[in-house]
Amino acid sequence: MARVKRAVNAQKKRRSILEASSGYRGQRSRLYRKAKEQQLHSLTYAYRDRRARKGDFRKLWITRINAAARANDITYNRLIQGLRLAEIEVDRKNLAELAVSDAAAFAGLVALAKAALPADVNAPAGEAA
């Protein structure tokens, strides 16, 4: 069987790992074994957090919408319910952007949502009809 020399491939593999881990602290950027292990963890975290980012942004949008809705005397869940009843389809991302950048347009949507809700739902929590 012929002898297989792997020096070039091994050096290329090591160099690529060390180049990818160039920003890490300490041994993790200088020693191949530590760098390889850290690279595995880094890619795992990146994969996980790309998915977590979607939920994080949704939470941020809901928080912004709720704050703006409460400034207009309605809660988040009643606003969403009213928009559904009024058959206004606007996603949370755009609704949050409206709440932050264009308060008048957001107030108009809130008015439409309030009008679509049943009358007893608009009453404050303490005054049930």
From Swiss-Prot:
Superkingdom, taxonomy of origin: Bacteria
Keyword check for DNA repair: no
Any one cellular-component term (Gene Ontology): ribosome
Single GO term (MF): structural constituent of ribosome
Keyword flag Ribosomal protein: yes
Sorted UniProt keywords: Ribonucleoprotein, Ribosomal protein, RNA-binding, rRNA-binding
GO biological process: ribosomal large subunit assembly; translation
InterPro entries, per the entry: Ribosomal_bL20 (IPR005813), RIBOSOMAL_L20_CS (IPR049946), Ribosomal_protein_bL20_C (IPR035566)
Entry-linked HAMAP family: Ribosomal_bL20
Family: Belongs to the bacterial ribosomal protein bL20 family.
Function: Binds directly to 23S ribosomal RNA and is necessary for the in vitro assembly process of the 50S ribosomal subunit. It is not involved in the protein synthesizing functions of that subunit.
Name assigned to this protein: Large ribosomal subunit protein bL20
Annotated source species: Rhodococcus opacus (strain B4)
